Amino acid sequence: VARRSVSLPGGPFLMGTDYAGGFESDGEGPVRPVFVAPFDMDAYPVTNDEFAAFVEDTGYVTTAQQMCSSFVFQGQLAANAGARVLDSVAAAPWWLLVEGASWLSPEGGGSTLQERGAHPAVHVSWHDASAYAAWSGGQLPTEAQWEYAARGGLRQALYPWGDEFTPGGRHMCNVWQGDFPTLNTAEDGHAFTCPVDAFAPNGFGLYSMAGNTWEWCADFWGTAFT
């Protein structure tokens, strides 16, 4: 996947959602008008190959590598029988603290990035993401910029492609399907991460703006909208 950027026109848009089926604790509501100036955004999330180039050029050591551990989803450990679990998240016990887990060894010590060069880099902290962005000549987007970009020019649609999750039976993103957190039917073709260009882009030509991995923004989370 070749790195390239997309120029976005910016302008006013409605940020947030009042969708009743969402999670109130996410603080996405109420809907409010926001203006963003024109900006550029990479068409794809940062891949393992791209992050490897950054590390090779700078010698950067990620937060997870410094801590010698990171959190791995429980189902992913089946591929790494030798993984050593150190702890779990009390409120979300499917997230396990695994020794040696990092961007280079996503499932812990002994795991590799084999055949995942075009997958998004994971186990990347906010500081890691900021360092990569600066190295690549950019910066992390604000939450407003990110949401504007993710919407792809649509007004208050549920997804970057519209209001229907699988229009015409077509899967549009890589997300958990089945009984969370024990059974993922992988109906979209991917049990965990997938190549960043596995699904069609949104209306702005941006890929993986829903599903696949969580993404960082520049600003802090809050619910005091002014």
Q: Where in this protein do the model-derived segments appear?
A:
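Non-catalytic, well-ordered alpha-helical segments in soluble enzyme domains
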Residues: 57-58
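Functional-site microenvironments in short loops/helix caps that host divalent-cation chemistry
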Residues: 7-8, 14, 18-19, 24, ...
